[in-house]
Amino acid sequence: MAFPPRRRLRLGPRGLPLLLSGLLLPLCRAFNLDVESPAEYSGPEGSYFGFAVDFFVPSASSRMFLLVGAPKANTTQPGIVEGGQVLKCDWSSHRRCQPIEFDATGNRDYAKDDPLEFKSHQWFGASVRSKQDKILACAPLYHWRTEMKQEREPVGTCFLQDGTKTVEYAPCRSKNIDADGQGFCQGGFSIDFTKADRVLLGGPGSFYWQGQLISDQVAEIVSKYDPKVYSIKYNNQLATRTAQAIFDDSYLGYSVAVGDFNGDGIDDFVSGVPRAARTLGMVYIYDGKNMSSLHNFTGEQMAAYFGFSVAATDINGDDYADVFIGAPLFMDRGSDGKLQEVGQVSVSLQKASGDFQTIKLNGFEVFARFGSAIAPLGDLDQDGFNDIAIAAPYGGEDKKGIVYIFNGRPTGLNAVPSQILEGKWAARSMPPSFGYSMKGATDIDKNGYPDLIVGAFGVDRAVLYRARPVITVNAGLEVYPSILNQENKTCPLPGTDLKVSCFNVRFCLKADGKGALPTKLDFQVELLLDKLKQKGAIRRALFLHNRSPGHSKNMTISRGGQMQCEELIAYLRDESEFRDKLTPITIFMEYWLDYRTAADATGLQPILNQFTPANVSRQAHILLDCGEDNVCKPKLEVSVDSDQKKIYIGDDNPLTLIVKAQNQGEGAYEAELIVSIPLQADFIGVVRNSEALARLSCAFKTENQTRQVVCDLGNPMKAGTQLLAGLRFSVHQQSEMDTSVKFDLQIQSSNLFDKVSPVVSYKVDLAVLAAVEIRGVSSPDHIFLPIPNWKYKENPETEEDVGPVVQHIYELRNNGPSSFSKAMLHLQWPYKYNNNTLLYILQYDIDGPMNCTSDMEINPLRIKISNSQTSEKNDTVGGQGDRNHLITKRDLTLNEGDVHTLGCGIAECLKIVCQVGRLDRGKSAILYVRSLLWTETFMNKENQNHSYSLKSSASFNVIEFPYKNLPIEDIFNSTLVTTNVTWGIQPAPMPVPVWVIILAVLAGLLLLAVLVFVMYRMGFFKRVRPPQEEQEREQLQPHENGEGNSET
């Protein structure tokens, strides 16, 4: 925001930033203001019409007007640009606005081309107030200069019109000039009248912008006026004086209001000082007799502009004036903890002791400038308490502006607005600023209710909202008898031979209100039986005359007259037609006013008092077998057991809850078993294959994000009832943090008393079970020596130079149901025996979440690995690339001899350690170890003609589970994989005889001939085509424009 400079630094025109400091702020329903057809007024475009507003009620005239300031309007004053106007607007349907002539002259001069004053851009009409025949309008940016100085100073000036007299009032146009005096006073920035016909004027620029309040008597202003005297002294003037430099830049007089705050019956002066106390802001209250200080209020937040607006009215009806203070830049923390500008109004309630109790009212929108204007409304709804309007001129949709109406009450201000007025004009070059100026507390249409004017200077508009007369209705409804006996059927049902149980419904209306209301008021009344039953449900009671649950009636009521009543007969349906006997039958009465017939001559319609409900209801009860008091008090109990004491994580655990429900008291109506089930469980159904268990009707539903199974226990569930039922669930999807699953069970009924059983919680513990196994296989599992065509090579380079491939495969598999997150696999491999190599490891591979390391170098001789390794890895049976040297058992003649077992207890072993990651149910991790049988070792003479069993061993242990809060048992196991090496003799292969081959060929040809003959006899080779019509044959010919056109 822009503010005036300190000390003698000059700006031209001086004082303009101070006036615009408020202007440049960024751009429900008292329920009885008429928002349907408000009176709208418009002024010259760009004139800021609506910057200030007031009512004008001249005592000598029956007509009443609106006063609207347009401070940037052009006038007929010679040589003046945008001098500003105040317009008087007729509130009637004509809605014409005419400028009031306060000053028709141009600038006055000391001499030719030596001006004394400067009226262009003076903002006349920036403030306007009236009292009876008197109108005070000011131009706070009016400039003048003394004959001694050439500099212009914004002292401000006002014009006071009293009846037919119009005088100028410029108390700051004095010899006390310059910034340290009244040279920058901007007199008339804020104004008001007191009850004793004094004028109160604020000049926030006096004394280095300390600010000043000045008050003079209207009679003295008029009597002492002399157009030839520029600086007039008033004998009865009250004014604040200059203070210490610490009070500079405080802006006393920025806003003003009046009210009695010391009980002497004389209006005292209230002024906002928004930059006082190091920009905390203050509000001063001065004695209206001598300008002495009565009370001060200080803001709580720097730069909130506390005191931007002030108002005084008795809001709580205790006959003491209360103070309203606006701080439109106040910031509060939002739900995210961040500061945001919402604005605030402080309401200080005056007590009999003279102290004040302050309550805070924060704005509802960010950057709306809540509290920019505050207007007392008088008693808007005639409830005995004054009301208030608070504006947020940059709130609402597209920043069009909002005015909130708050009602007074004995404890102060109702914090919830009863009505919200919204601007409807879009922004032009600046925001509409709907609500920047407001004035209420005047009954312009004489209907007994005060009205409200709202200005929107950004779109050059002013709006008059008239208050609608309030009608208070007293409605009565009586039902008798209130206890309905279904067995007592005494009323004939029209059109039948049946008799029904009936009861009487008596409904009454009385209406009254203050102000201009018609003597007769038309209402429409609607009655509805069994109101609380949902739409489409069977209503248990009907009216006898129309056999319907509803009845409509038009009633004409005399305003202020006696209660007017009518009576109807209603009856109960037969008990076979409905279930619910326990819930009360609600009889509901609602009424509406016929607003069109109640409107006044101007079309203004009254409104029903919103604080009086527009409906009334009564209840009737069906007589029950529940003792003399007709109140059933059941005693409901539930217990539960299950067929499973433990549930394993990861498994689809079937679980059956055996529930026992019983009632040891009086009947329970619409009784239901409610089972709240955990997220890990799904409802399967009711156990129906047991004679001992009741076959309940159950359904799954979600209630307030709680998953429930609801089972019907009867209506009523009679005294002494015991039910045993089985409910089947599937429990799965347990989380890693769960330790149990919990079911909550309760019996609920619709009874009024003792309607539910205690909640019973049943827990089933969770457990971990992981069936982990390790399996191994050798591929091949036998190798037979000697190997044909194998020759020793001193420096082997390929696999064939060493010997046949031997692959051991180990699979670690989790059969579940639970998962584990970490395990260790230890492999021991028979590597050497007596310094002779046994199984030479070429490489190892893994499949699955596993990482391995070995304690020796793998393939240190860098023997080239065959390309067939991939296929062999996936072949768990064997599969060396060259099977010519492998001989199966049935092909061999074994040499019986000693079998030497070479495992890690005898041979030197290489160790491979693997860390296995998470394995869920059904998952596995596989280790493939590819090696070569070191044939040289077994071809040594001392090792021949022996059988060898080469054994590798693998063991595992699970070391970690993902379940943090459950006890875990150790899981471990081991296995061995054996490769047998055996010496044997390979028999010579026997060739297939030629005659066998010839016979096989002939047999095949004979079979083919037989098949062809059979198919021929069945007509398989005969082709049958359907006849084609001529048109179809023509379509096969090329078209004229087709590719086959012969002319092309």
UniProtKB/Swiss-Prot annotation:
Superkingdom in the source lineage: Eukaryota
Motif position, GFFKR motif: 1019-1023
FG-GAP repeat coordinates: 32-98, 109-170, 173-225, 237-291, 292-357, 358-415, 419-482
CC annotations in GO: external side of plasma membrane; focal adhesion; integrin alphav-beta6 complex; integrin alphav-beta8 complex; integrin complex
Residues bound to Ca(2+) 3: 379, 381, 383, 385, 387
Extracellular side: 31-992
Alphabetic keyword roster: Calcium, Cell adhesion, Cell junction, Cell membrane, Cleavage on pair of basic residues, Disulfide bond, Glycoprotein, Host cell receptor for virus entry, Host-virus interaction, Integrin, Membrane, Metal-binding, Receptor, Repeat, Signal, Transmembrane, Transmembrane helix
Topological relation to the membrane, as annotated: Single-pass type I membrane protein
One Pfam family in the UniProt entry: FG-GAP
Glycosylation sites: 74, 290, 296, 488, 554, 615, 704, 835, 851, 874, 945, 973, 980
Disulfide bond entries: 89-97, 138-158, 172-185, 491-502, 508-565, 626-632, 698-711, 852-914, 904-909
Keyword Cytoplasm belongs to the record: no
Gene3D superfamilies for the chain: Bicelle-embedded integrin alpha(iib) transmembrane segment, Integrin alpha, N-terminal, Integrin domains. Chain A, domain 2, ntegrin, alpha v. Chain A, domain 3, ntegrin, alpha v. Chain A, domain 4
Basic and acidic residues: bias regions: 1027-1042
Main localization category: membrane
GO molecular function (one): virus receptor activity
InterPro entries per UniProt: FG-GAP, Int_alpha_beta-p, Integrin_alpha, Integrin_alpha_C_CS, Integrin_alpha_Ig-like_1, Integrin_alpha_Ig-like_2, Integrin_alpha_Ig-like_3, Integrin_alpha_N
Residues bound to Ca(2+) 1: 260, 262, 264, 266, 268
Topology feature Cytoplasmic, residues: 1017-1048
Binding site for Ca(2+) 4: 443, 445, 447, 449, 451
Compartment(s) of residence: Cell membrane; Cell junction, Focal adhesion
TM region(s), chain numbering: 993-1016
GO BP field: angiogenesis; blood vessel development; cell adhesion mediated by integrin; cell-cell adhesion; integrin-mediated signaling pathway
Function, in words: The alpha-V (ITGAV) integrins are receptors for vitronectin, cytotactin, fibronectin, fibrinogen, laminin, matrix metalloproteinase-2, osteopontin, osteomodulin, prothrombin, thrombospondin, TGFB1 and vWF. They recognize the sequence R-G-D in a wide array of ligands. Alpha-V integrins may play a role in embryo implantation, angiogenesis and wound healing. ITGAV:ITGB3 binds to fractalkine (CX3CL1) and may act as its coreceptor in CX3CR1-dependent fractalkine signaling. ITGAV:ITGB3 binds to NRG1 (via EGF domain) and this binding is essential for NRG1-ERBB signaling.
Subunit record text: Heterodimer of an alpha and a beta subunit. The alpha subunit is composed of a heavy and a light chain linked by a disulfide bond. Alpha-V (ITGAV) associates with either beta-1 (ITGB1), beta-3 (ITGB3), beta-5 (ITGB5), beta-6 (ITGB6) or beta-8 (ITGB8). Interacts with RAB25. Interacts with CIB1. Integrins ITGAV:ITGB3 and ITGAV:ITGB5 interact with FBLN5 (via N-terminus). ITGAV:ITGB3 and ITGAV:ITGB5 interact with CCN3. ITGAV:ITGB3 interacts with ADGRA2. ITGAV:ITGB3 interacts with FGF2; it is likely that FGF2 can simultaneously bind ITGAV:ITGB3 and FGF receptors.
Designated name of the protein: Integrin alpha-V
UniProt source species: Bos taurus
Gene: ITGAV
